């Protein structure tokens, strides 16, 4: 095309001359104008346009290459060409490849110009006088790289024909202030442009569009562009304040403008240079002070005053001087060039553009701007490059952004590559699998059924599934075989068939009903617990008689550490049944018991089906451990699920939500354990057969420690040879002073601690002996060496020395080589874990643990006193308590007068403390009421309760207390205070009191007896209603204790206050009340 040939010809001409920067910029503008003018596409055009003729004549006035004119005098300010013009021209030289963005896709109509290196004109060494000598030259926008264009009568768009007078008018800086006249100011939210690279911006404000048409008509197509600080501000084409934009912007020239759609005006601009904002006029200011201030002023762009746009007075910004030979700058330029080459190699679309940019390496400022314009960085980071006047800083910031972009490009490329590789591998594997499968089918190597279902068919041969389960199996198997191998539902079906065939359908272990063997197993594993063992043997004997053991639900309840779980294991061993355990702690949802439906991702069966799979039989002993830990307030659904599981009438058709077929649990022997029955819901408790496992007595604890705990601890510590001896008295003291609870866990811990400390002492003793023996052997060896020294003559020594051959080099090296494997073996043995050899303990080393040295092993005693009061004062009664952990203890009730009756207020009151809960507070209130009525009835002259201010306290205030069993203790304490008679310290009592004086039954008599004996009480008053429980309490527990059953409180009174006459009880508080009566009489007179 003619257009391309024109530009190419002009380039060839330029290559033969060294021209001034201004002329070079004019030539570049001419070539770009030719490429951008559509009328040049006319095939009838036969001569060069006027621009080419004019600039060709300018070229002829230049001197040929090598004859560079000398520097002339400095140009004056009136010429319109300042020092800034030359610097900026030099800075922007070579940017002739300005191609409007709107023409990038016009491949069919406009040919892409070739990049000609000759078009980049070197301007180094060109003096300012050479610019002065160019006739008719002018500096557009103060020396910017793009030259002015000719006049246009109506330049509304770029499709109007240009003529020879289309040059832009000259706009220069003021010689005094260095400022440009006011120019149109436009804000930009997108990334700010950098000098040397064209950009496009869309304008929607009608006033701004009108002003652009105006400056084009005036042949002054210049404006300034500033980046906004906050991109979230309203979408506007007017700058409303200086604070809303950055201070450094760009001075631009309009290259082309189009209207892509109604209401949108697209401007292709070319950034000429950096500029700083000196003053800003906004549409709002023009009506006020600013307009008044500028009235009468006359400047080249004064026509902008009448438009509702923002215009600014700007000052060109110069780069800081720099040294091109600086090592730092060269290093930065080379780094940028290398990274750009990498980017070009990875992105062929940008390869040509990057190649053009790398040719600017000799001009670091323009090279930095090129890199900043090329990369897609954060607009704020680009603005930092724009504001960087220090060339080294500008290069550093550009390098930093380029590294980030390259890293992101690498990550993106690797991600795409990995995804593509995985997809290719998947397709390859899929093809190979399908190919092999087809070959196997044709060769008849495999059956048509899927291999994955064959393992389930193999399991099915050994199972006796119900019809419902078999139907579900076949349906799921058919579904699985019909699914694609890569379907997500395939895994769901496979897991379901796996669980369904893992249930032991029809598999039962043979029960063993041997009473003798069962008794031996129970006695072997447990000492005492006669009642529990008898109940279990009765249960087994029923199975022996009937020939089967139906699914029973046993519940072993008792304090912690009494062996409930181990009893369940012994029952399973006695019956020859598999043992599985389900812990109830933490179960808060019914789905954990009955499973989740298969609609949920990752659903599994519940605990019951999982336990059957683990047992591999349909009649295991299934231990529901700590069923009282089931939180009824949060997991009522789980408790309701156990109503079905533990009901023999319903559990033959248990349905798990995941399996969704009926499973027979009627042959399962359920054994539950609980610490406190009160935490189990009544409907669930009704389905169980309760077996109470009471706490151990001291004698039982001693025997269990001797038979089980001490041998186990000695075995774990490696001291089985009788090296540690614990006396029976020591065990008894350990129980009395350290662990009074009903269970065995604490005493087990203490015995383990004894053996651990004993092992330390034994090892220290053995090592001390080994050290002594070693030192003795060394002394003996040294003495032997000293005693065996013989005299050797000089001649013999010389002969012996000569007989020793000096080793050769070969032999020495051979020895070194032979030693190397030894070194490696030594290193290898060091790295490997050394096997610990058991210490051989001499038989004479023995440790005796006695009552005297017991505290050296387990620390100081915890329970130092057996009773609080040796001789209790009046108002102190000894009650008995029983905790849910199975421990019996003494409970003291203390009552005092807060004021003497004579000096008090005369009003009766009672105050109760000691962390008492509601039931116990009511019991104290009932006791107070009954005590008053009892004193009025039996000691009418004792007016104690008419004016007594009483404080009742129960010690151990940190421990919450509840229950009615302290009723007679409260009453006895109050009556003791009223009669001023102390109670015997050896008498303890328990029982609920009513307002009529009736004593009602309470629980935990066995544990309370043990607690009373520990505190030295040999007489126990208890309700007559529970007298029959004494028959079930072992004799060793009742030994040394006098039991007094009572039905009314009068029986209690007769026991604690024998031989108390009426006169003695009536005379107690007479003097105090006489004082009180006199005090009241005197108060009335006043």
Swiss-Prot record:
Domain Lon N-terminal positions: 183-406
Record keywords, A-Z: ATP-binding, DNA-binding, Hydrolase, Mitochondrion, Nucleotide-binding, Protease, Serine protease, Transit peptide
One record GO biological process: protein quality control for misfolded or incompletely synthesized proteins
Function according to Swiss-Prot or TrEMBL: ATP-dependent serine protease that mediates the selective degradation of misfolded, unassembled or oxidatively damaged polypeptides as well as certain short-lived regulatory proteins in the mitochondrial matrix. May also have a chaperone function in the assembly of inner membrane protein complexes. Participates in the regulation of mitochondrial gene expression and in the maintenance of the integrity of the mitochondrial genome. Binds to mitochondrial DNA in a site-specific manner.
Source organism per UniProt: Scheffersomyces stipitis (strain ATCC 58785 / CBS 6054 / NBRC 10063 / NRRL Y-11545) (Yeast)
UniProt cross-references to SMART domains, sorted A to Z: AAA (SM00382), LON (SM00464)
InterPro entries reported in the protein's UniProt record: AAA+_ATPase (IPR003593), ATPase_AAA_core (IPR003959), Lon_bac/euk-typ (IPR004815), Lon_lid (IPR054594), Lon_proteolytic (IPR008269), Lon_Prtase (IPR027065), Lon_prtase_N (IPR003111), Lon_prtase_N_sf (IPR046336)
Residues reported to bind ATP: 558-565
Name of the gene: PIM1
Region of interest (Disordered), residue spans: 61-176, 767-788, 800-835
Residue ranges with Low complexity bias: 69-83, 124-163
GO molecular function: ATP binding; ATP hydrolysis activity; ATP-dependent peptidase activity; serine-type endopeptidase activity; single-stranded DNA binding
Catalytic activity: Hydrolysis of proteins in presence of ATP
Lineage of source species: Eukaryota, Fungi, Dikarya, Ascomycota, Saccharomycotina
EC number: 3.4.21.53
Highest taxon, organism lineage: Eukaryota
Signal peptide: none
The protein's name: Lon protease homolog, mitochondrial
Domain Lon proteolytic: 871-1059
Composition bias type Basic and acidic residues, residue spans: 85-120, 767-782, 815-827
Record's subcellular location: Mitochondrion matrix
Active site, renumbered: 965, 1008
Subunit structure: Homohexamer or homoheptamer. Organized in a ring with a central cavity.
Matching Pfam families: AAA, Lon_C, Lon_lid, LON_substr_bdg
Annotated transit peptide: 1-55
Family that this chain belongs to: Belongs to the peptidase S16 family.
A GO CC annotation given for this chain: mitochondrial matrix
Primary location: mitochondrion
Entries under Gene3D superfamilies matching the protein: 1.10.8.60, 1.20.5.5270, 1.20.58.1480, 3.30.230.10, LON domain-like (2.30.130.40), P-loop containing nucleotide triphosphate hydrolases (3.40.50.300)
């Amino acid at each position: 095309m003619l257009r391309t040939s024109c530009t190419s010809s002009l380039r060839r001409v330029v290559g033969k001359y060294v021209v001034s920067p201004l002329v070079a910029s004019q030539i570049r503008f001419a070539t770009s104008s030719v490429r951008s003018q559509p009328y040049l596409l006319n095939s009838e055009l036969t001569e060069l346009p006027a621009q080419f003729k004019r600039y060709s004549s300018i070229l002829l006035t230049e001197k040929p290459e090598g004859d560079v004119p000398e520097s002339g005098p400095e140009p004056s300010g009136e010429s319109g060409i300042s020092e800034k013009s030359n610097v900026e021209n030099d800075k922007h030289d070579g940017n002739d490849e300005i191609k409007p963005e709107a023409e990038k896709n016009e491949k069919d109509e406009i040919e892409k110009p070739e990049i000609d290196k000759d078009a980049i004109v070197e301007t180094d060494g060109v003096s300012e006088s050479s610019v002065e000598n160019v006739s008719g030259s002018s500096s557009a926008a103060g020396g910017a790289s793009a030259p002015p264009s000719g006049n246009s009568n109506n330049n509304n768009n770029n499709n109007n024909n240009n003529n020879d007078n289309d040059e832009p008018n000259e706009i220069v800086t003021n010689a005094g202030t260095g400022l440009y006249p006011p120019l149109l100011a436009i804000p930009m939210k997108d990334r700010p442009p950098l000098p040397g690279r064209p950009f496009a911006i869309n304008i929607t404000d009608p006033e701004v569009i009108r002003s652009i048409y105006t400056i084009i008509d005036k042949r002054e197509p210049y404006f300034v562009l500033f980046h906004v600080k906050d991109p979230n501000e309203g979408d506007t084409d007017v700058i409303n304040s200086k604070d809303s934009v950055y201070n450094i912007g760009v001075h631009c020239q309009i290259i082309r403008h189009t209207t892509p759609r109604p209401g949108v005006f697209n401007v292709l601009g070319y950034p000429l240079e950096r500029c700083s904002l000196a003053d800003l006029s906004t549409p709002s200011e023009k009506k006020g002070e600013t307009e008044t201030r500028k009235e009468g002023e006359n400047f080249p762009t004064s026509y902008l005053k009448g438009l509702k746009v923002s215009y600014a007075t700007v000052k060109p910004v110069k780069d800081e001087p720099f040294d091109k030979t600086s090592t730092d700058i060269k290093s930065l330029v080379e780094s940028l060039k290398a990274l750009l080459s990498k980017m070009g190699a990875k992105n062929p679309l940008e390869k040509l553009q990057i190649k053009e940019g790398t040719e600017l390496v000799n001009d670091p400022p323009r090279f930095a701007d090129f890199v900043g314009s090329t990369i897609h960085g954060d607009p704020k980071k680009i603005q930092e490059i724009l504001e960087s006047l220090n060339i080294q800083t500008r290069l550093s910031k550009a390098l930093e952004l380029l590294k980030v972009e390259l890293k992101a490009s690498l990550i993106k490329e690797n991600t795409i590559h990995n995804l593509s590789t995985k997809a290719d591998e998947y397709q390859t594997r899929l093809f190979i699998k399908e190919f092999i499968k087809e070959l196997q089918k044709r060769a008849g190597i495999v059956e048509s059924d899927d291999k994955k279902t064959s393992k389930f068919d193999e399991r099915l041969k050994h199972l006796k599934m119900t019809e419902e389960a078999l139907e579900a199996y076949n349906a799921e198997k058919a579904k699985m075989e019909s699914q694609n191998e890569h379907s997500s539902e395939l895994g769901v079906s496979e897991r379901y068939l796996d669980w369904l065939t893992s249930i032991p359908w029809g598999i039962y272990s043979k029960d063993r009903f041997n009473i003798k063997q069962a008794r031996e197993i129970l006695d072997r594993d447990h000492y005492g617990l006669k009642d529990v063992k008898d109940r279990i043997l009765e249960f087994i004997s029923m199975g022996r008689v009937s020939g089967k053991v139906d699914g029973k639900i046993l519940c072993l309840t008792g304090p912690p550490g009494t062996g409930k779980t181990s009893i369940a294991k012994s029952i399973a061993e006695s019956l020859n049944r598999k043992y599985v355990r389900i812990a109830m702690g933490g179960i808060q949802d019914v789905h954990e018991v009955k499973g989740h439906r298969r609609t949920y991702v990752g659903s599994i069966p519940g605990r019951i089906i999982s336990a059957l799979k683990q047992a591999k039989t349909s009649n295991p002993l299934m231990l529901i451990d700590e069923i009282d830990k089931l939180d009824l307030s949060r997991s009522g659904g789980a408790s309701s699920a156990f109503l079905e599981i533990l009901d023999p009438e319903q559990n033959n058709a248990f349905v798990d939500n995941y399996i969704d077929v009926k499973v027979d649990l009627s042959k399962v022997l359920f054994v539950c354990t609980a610490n406190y029955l009160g935490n189990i819901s009544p409907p669930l408790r009704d389905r169980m057969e309760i077996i109470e496992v009471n706490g151990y007595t001291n004698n039982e604890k001693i025997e269990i420690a001797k038979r089980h705990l001490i041998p186990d601890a000695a075995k774990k510590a490696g001291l089985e040879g009788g090296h540690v001896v614990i006396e029976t008295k020591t065990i008894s003291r350990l129980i009395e002073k350290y662990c009074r609870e009903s269970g065995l866990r604490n005493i087990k811990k203490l015995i383990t601690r004894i053996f651990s400390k004993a092992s330390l002492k034994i090892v220290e003793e053995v090592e001390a002996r080994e050290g002594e023996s070693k030192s003795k052997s060394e002394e003996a060896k040294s003495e032997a060496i000293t005693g065996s020294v013989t005299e050797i003559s000089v001649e013999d020594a010389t002969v012996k020395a000569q007989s020793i051959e000096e080793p050769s080099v070969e032999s020495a090296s051979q020895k070194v080589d032979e030693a190397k494997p030894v070194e490696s073996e030594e290193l290898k043995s060091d790295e490997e874990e050394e096997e610990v050899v058991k210490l051989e303990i001499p038989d004479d080393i023995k440790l005796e643990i006695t009552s005297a040295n017991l505290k050296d092993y387990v620390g100081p005693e915890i329970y130092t006193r057996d009773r609080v009061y040796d001789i209790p004062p009046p108002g102190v009664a000894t009650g008995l308590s029983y905790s849910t952990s199975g421990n019996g203890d003494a409970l003291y009730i203390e009552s005092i007068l807060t004021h003497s009756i004579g000096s008090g207020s005369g009003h009766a009151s009672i105050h109760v403390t000691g962390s008492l809960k509601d039931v116990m507070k009511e019991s104290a209130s009932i006791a107070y009421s009954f005590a008053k009525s009892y004193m009025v009835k039996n000691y009418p002259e004792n007016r104690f309760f008419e004016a007594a201010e009483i404080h009742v306290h129960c010690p151990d205030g940190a421990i919450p207390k509840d229950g009615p069993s302290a009723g007679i203790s409260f009453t006895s304490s109050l009556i003791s205070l009223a009669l001023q008679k102390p109670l015997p310290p050896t008498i303890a009592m328990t029982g609920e009191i009513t307002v009529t004086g009736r004593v009602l039954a309470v629980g935990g008599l066995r544990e309370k007896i043990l607690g009373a004996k520990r505190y030295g009480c040999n007489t126990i008053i208890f309700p007559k209603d529970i007298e029959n429980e004494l028959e079930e309490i072992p004799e060793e527990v009742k030994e040394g204790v006098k039991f007094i059953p009572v039905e009314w409180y009068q029986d209690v009174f007769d026991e604690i206050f024998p031989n108390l006459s009426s006169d003695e009880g009536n005379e107690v508080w007479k003097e105090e009340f006489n004082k009180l009566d006199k005090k009241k009489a005197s108060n009335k007179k006043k």
